[in-house]
From Swiss-Prot:
Non-allosteric. It catalyses: beta-D-fructose 6-phosphate + diphosphate = beta-D-fructose 1,6-bisphosphate + phosphate + H(+). The gene is pfp. It comes from Rhodospirillum rubrum (strain ATCC 11170 / ATH 1.1.1 / DSM 467 / LMG 4362 / NCIMB 8255 / S1). This is Pyrophosphate--fructose 6-phosphate 1-phosphotransferase. The record marks D109 as: Important for catalytic activity and substrate specificity.
Length: 404
């Protein structure tokens, strides 16, 4: 444990609980006498380079607690990935401000950022403790049982499809909902948690872990529609064909990519529009509608899992404890124990950074377009208390008089 200042930053997509992790790290840091000041970097590593800091030592505990319960990233975020030159600029600022502890809250790309900064600090012989705090609605961080942000987003998806199912029952047709998830289908699969009755939707769930064939998709939709008179489909934005090419790229001549080289899958309704058009054209079904859940999944106010909030706070607190009491850098990871409880560990950055976790085969039905009971058992405890329920009128039909 050495004297110094703390910097906390948030990276990647906002979530409903990322502020819990930030506040957890800030309040825990303020408990240690060796911590001189606690800074928040505005817009992630870009804020460090620009020396855009907020002094969170001066922030009241009450206001921090209010911010903790507020969705999205209170410090602002970034998608930037530091290279060597970028890291050298980071070190220049960190040294000038005498910062000794760096906590970065984020997902895959953010964990890789922490790894790079950590390695460059070691090369420069600069005493900097670097801890990655997990966050991603995609739930695709390796080693972790699940990641903060995912349970609340999953709760939103489950409730959204529950509502869509009720709407679709009243006015039957085909509904296609596109859900976030580039490589991992956890969030799309969460749509199944909104089902209560046997004929509830989603009736079909398509995940990036399985190859997507357009003709097979249309055939599946038509089979369900012919059998039930309606069909609700949950589709991951990351679905791809047999060659590995994302279906979305078939729509555009130029595909936009972010700073990490990732194809921009979100922020457009193109995939939903494509699938709607294909189903209409090849199946002959007239009433086909599509939606893209988009950014609503990430930080929807009023749809937060209490389990997610608690664990997001705790990974922030544990990050500080590991930094103060330990001698190594790393990533805080979540491990399930028993039916449902969790334990936290500090995992080497190399074991987490830049790696992607996908849904295991045991979570995906043999037919490739549904989930298993194992997945439902895995996810249900994460959604938290107070999930809304839906009911139906009993089918007490009155006999016809005119027999028409």
């Amino acid at each position: 444990m050495f004297k110094g200042k703390v910097v906390v930053a948030q990276g990647g997509g906002p979530t409903a609980v990322i502020n819990q992790s930030m506040v957890g790290a800030v309040l825990e840091s303020r408990k240690f006498r060796n911590v001189e000041l606690v800074y928040g970097a505005v817009h992630g590593v870009r804020g460090i380079v620009d020396e855009h800091f907020l002094d969170l030592t001066q922030e009241t505990t009450h206001n921090l607690e209010m911010v903790a319960e507020t969705p999205s990233s209170a410090l602002g975020s970034t998608r930037e990935k530091p290279d060597l030159k970028y890291c050298q600029e980071i070190f220049k600022v960190l040294k000038a401000h005498e910062i000794g502890y760096f906590f970065y809250i984020g997902g895959n790309d953010s964990s890789d950022t922490v790894r790079i900064v950590s390695e460059e600090a070691a090369k420069a012989d600069y005493g900097l403790r670097c801890i990655h705090i997990p966050k991603t609605i995609d739930n695709d961080l390796v080693v972790n049982d699940h990641t903060p942000g995912f349970p609340s987003a999953a709760r939103f998806v489950a409730q959204a499809f529950s509502g869509v199912n009720l709407d679709n029952q009243a006015l039957p047709g085909v509904y296609i909902g596109v859900v976030m998830g580039r490589h991992a289908g956890f969030l799309t699969a969460a749509s199944a948690l909104g089902k209560k009755f046997q004929d509830d939707g989603p009736h079909l769930i398509y995940l990036p872990e399985r190859t997507f064939d357009v003709d097979t998709f249309v055939s599946d939709v038509k089979e369900v529609y012919d059998r039930t008179g309606r069909c609700i489909v949950a589709v991951s934005e990351g679905i791809h064909d047999a060659s590995g090419e994302p279906i979305i790229t078939k729509l555009a001549e130029e595909v936009e990519r972010d700073a990490h080289g990732n194809v921009q899958l979100s922020g457009t309704g193109a995939l939903a529009d494509l699938l709607v058009s294909v189903v209409k054209k090849k199946s002959g079904i007239k009433r086909v509608r599509g939606d893209t859940l988009g950014y609503l999944q990430r930080s929807f106010v009023g749809c937060v899992s209490d389990v997610d909030q608690r664990e997001a706070r705790e990974v922030g607190e544990k990050a500080v404890q590991y930094a103060m009491w330990g001698q190594t850098n790393g990533s805080v990871t979540i491990h399930r124990t028993g039916f449902y409880s969790v334990d936290y560990q500090l995992t080497p950055l190399l074991d987490v950074a830049g790696k992607t976790r996908t849904m295991p085969d045991s979570f995906i039905a043999a037919n490739g377009h549904d989930v298993t009971t194992d997945f439902l058992m895995y996810l249900r405890p994460l959604l938290g208390r107070g999930m809304p329920d839906a009911y139906r009128l009993r089918d007490n039909r009155v006999a016809k008089v005119l027999n028409r």
